[in-house]
């Protein structure tokens, strides 16, 4: 599912040098102090930042060769990313339907009800916990084959 070999990223006061493998069916957690490189590792794996060396494979392909259809198989939660907080969940549903052919609208709405996430309230009015729940529900809403979750 995910393989990083000697992935390097150099910042002014930090150097990431990471190798790891996540096999199908496995749950793997990265645990470390603030600034240890957990978020950097996730962003590198997703191709969101340029790395300074090493190789990254996801879903059996080099990360750079992933197509849109491959990326639609990923469910991603990043602590510093999400939808505009001026949107309502019902607006997010429309976006998800247009981006993910496998988006399961009815299941998503049912889960929102189960976890008390209102569809007609702006995200900026949500508590921190409600925002976190929404991100996870969105990551699970389109039958993703691989989940990457970077939460605080």
Give the ranges of each region predicted by the language model.
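Conserved ABC transporter NBD signature motif
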Residues: 54-65, 69-70
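A short, flexible loop at the N-terminus of ABC-type nucleotide-binding domains that lies
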Residues: 1-19, 24-26, 67
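The feature captures the beta-strand-to-loop junction immediately N-terminal to the Walker
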Residues: 31-33
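ABC nucleotide-binding domain signature
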Residues: 29, 72-79
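Catalytic Walker B motif of ABC-type/P-loop ATPase nucleotide-binding domains
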Residues: 147-151
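ABC-family P-loop ATPase nucleotide-binding domains
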Residues: 78-135
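Helix-to-loop junction immediately C-terminal to a conserved catalytic motif
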Residues: 46
């Amino acid at each position: 599912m995910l393989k990083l070999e000697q992935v390097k990223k150099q910042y002014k006061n930090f150097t990431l040098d990471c190798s790891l493998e996540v096999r199908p069916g496995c749950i793997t957690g990265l645990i470390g102090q603030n600034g240890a490189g957990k978020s950097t590792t996730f962003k590198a794996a997703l191709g969101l930042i340029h790395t300074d060396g090493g190789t990254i494979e996801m879903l059996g392909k080099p990360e750079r060769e992933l197509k849109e259809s491959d990326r639609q198989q990923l469910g991603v939660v990043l602590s510093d990313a999400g939808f505009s907080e001026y949107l309502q969940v019902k607006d997010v549903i429309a976006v998800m339907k247009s981006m993910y052919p496998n988006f399961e609208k009815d299941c998503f709405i049912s889960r929102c009800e189960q976890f008390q996430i209102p569809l007609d309230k702006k995200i900026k009015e949500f508590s921190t916990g409600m925002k976190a729940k929404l991100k996870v529900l969105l990551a699970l809403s389109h039958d993703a084959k691989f989940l990457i979750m970077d939460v605080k």
